[in-house]
Amino acid sequence: MSFAGKRYWLVGASEGLGLALAQALSREGAEVILSARSAEGLAVACAGVPRSRSVVVDVADSASVTRAAQAVGDIDGLVFLAGVYWPMTAQAVKPEQLEAMCDINFTGCARVVAAVLPKM
């Protein structure tokens, strides 16, 4: 499969697996749009990835996702890597953290997919 000339949006790509994937796709000729909550982290990440640009997004905020999807434009592929995790036991559930994990890890993904699927 050739990635040359393709555009990929990587959400949660300012570090770790997302950044590594952005670097790999770029090496294969793809244009990559990196997104995360931190503009500063994205600036550092994009500096090391040719054919990249950044769009800040908070996947827990529907308006932010809508704005980001509009800024990203048409894409050939989407990779959702955003996520948070706070370990907790069933005996010590922290409702606010549990809700945040669900909102970012699951609902956030659904928000992003819903925003870009009509354009793909």
Where in the sequence are the language-model features?
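Conserved glycine-rich cofactor-binding loop
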Residues: 14-15
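Conserved NAD(P)H cofactor-binding loop of Rossmann-fold oxidoreductase domains
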Residues: 82-87
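Substrate-binding pocket helix/loop in short-chain dehydrogenase/reductase
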Residues: 89-90, 94-102
